[in-house]
């Protein structure tokens, strides 16, 4: 007879049993934890932690296409196996070095909204400024050999760079956590996400001129295109560590960042490669929020969803019809992120359309 059940049955009244409900969950958790440890089943241990800390015990029963995740148990097993190979060890070492370098600088999220990448260039030489962590208000051009000071657009673009570097940092930590299981990488993501969650909702919607507008403007960035690119990867990092977050931390991150970001993007209709990236961000946020209605918008919405855009913008020869190789592979990346995100919901987008987009350009047609 399980220990948790014996403890619960010792209560003589319904009220006592109710009051012992917390301990019932605790003993159930410990019994299952011991069982899964004996079985060596890391996948079930992750699900158990997510169920216990979220209070949603139905998670334990979810299998296959019934869950919300970016990496299946098989994916995680493959990542960990690959990380032990000769080439895998090199990748892990590279990621570890990048995370180590990032942690030499401030990890605090900027208090202000970010700007536009196109503003991070010298007005004389059209050369991108050299990013320096300790110079948020002085942007250096190596061709001029001078600092440009007093231009708000340049300084807001510096914040853009910080946000993007933070995205890369959390994405790198995500793969290190999945590959090694080391809790420190989950903690790195947790700390930064909580910081963003505490600031994101308070940022105002703006464009590159710092004007509040719903014409493709963002919050962390000056345009929604950057917003969705950021959300696509950060939502993945969040879901990777969600099983080790407390219920309060999940609530803070979802209400402070994920939900406001989804609300913003649901009201940013665009077209062509922009909307393909919008759908990538919405699909990722929908999975992270476990919200099929958001996923449905990204995939099926008339004039804006994944299927509509494929029909409108994919030529019969496999190319996306925006007139250049760059604007073929750039939106293709978004389509791949979208297809991968929605696999867990039984939505199969790795089909002939995606196949053609890879194969036909290689043929030189």
At which residue positions do the language-model features occur?
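Extracellular polysaccharide-recognition and catalytic grooves
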Residues: 252-365
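Extracellular glycan-targeting catalytic surfaces
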Residues: 12, 18-270, 276-283, 303, ...
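Solenoid-repeat scaffolds in large eukaryotic assemblies
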Residues: 2, 45, 185-189, 294-298, ...
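Intrinsic-disorder/low-complexity, polar/charged segments
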Residues: 13-14, 85, 234, 289-291, ...
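Residue-level recognition of short, structured coil/turn motifs
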Residues: 14, 181, 246, 290-291, ...
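A short beta-strand element within beta-rich, extracytoplasmic domains
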Residues: 1, 7-10
């Amino acid at each position: 007879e399980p220990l948790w059940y014996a403890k619960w049955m010792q209560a003589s009244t319904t009220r006592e049993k109710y009051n012992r409900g917390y301990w019932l969950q605790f003993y159930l958790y410990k019994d299952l934890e011991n069982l899964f440890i004996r079985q060596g089943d890391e996948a079930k241990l992750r699900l158990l932690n997510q169920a216990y800390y979220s209070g949603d015990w139905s998670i334990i029963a979810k299998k296959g296409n019934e869950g919300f995740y970016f990496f299946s148990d098989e994916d995680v097993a493959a990542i960990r196996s690959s990380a032990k190979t000769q080439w895998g060890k090199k990748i892990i070492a590279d990621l570890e070095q990048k995370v180590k370098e990032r942690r030499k600088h401030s990890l605090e999220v900027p208090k202000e909204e970010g700007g536009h990448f196109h503003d991070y260039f010298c007005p004389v030489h059209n050369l991108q400024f050299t990013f320096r962590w300790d110079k948020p208000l002085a942007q250096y051009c190596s061709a001029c050999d001078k600092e440009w000071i007093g231009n708000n657009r340049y300084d807001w673009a510096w914040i853009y760079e910080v946000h993007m570097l933070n995205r890369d940092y959390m994405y790198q930590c995500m793969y290190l956590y999945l590959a090694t299981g080391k809790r420190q990488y989950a903690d790195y993501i947790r700390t930064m996400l909580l910081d963003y969650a505490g600031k994101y909702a308070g940022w105002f919607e703006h464009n590159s001129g710092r004007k509040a507008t719903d014409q493709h403007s963002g919050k962390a960035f000056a345009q929604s295109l950057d917003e969705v690119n950021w959300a696509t990867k950060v939502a993945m990092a969040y879901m990777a560590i969600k099983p080790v977050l407390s219920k309060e931390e999940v609530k803070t991150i979802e209400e402070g960042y994920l939900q406001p970001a989804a609300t913003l993007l649901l009201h940013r209709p665009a077209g062509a490669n922009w909307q393909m990236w919008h759908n990538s961000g919405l699909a990722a946020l929908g999975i992270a929020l476990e919200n099929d209605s958001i996923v449905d918008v990204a995939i099926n919405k008339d004039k804006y969803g994944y299927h509509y855009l494929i029909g409108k913008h994919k030529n019969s020869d496999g190319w996306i019809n925006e007139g250049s190789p760059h604007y073929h592979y750039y939106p293709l990346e978004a389509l791949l992120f979208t297809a991968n995100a929605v696999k867990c919901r039984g939505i199969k987008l790795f089909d002939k359309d995606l196949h053609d987009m890879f194969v036909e350009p290689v043929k030189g047609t």
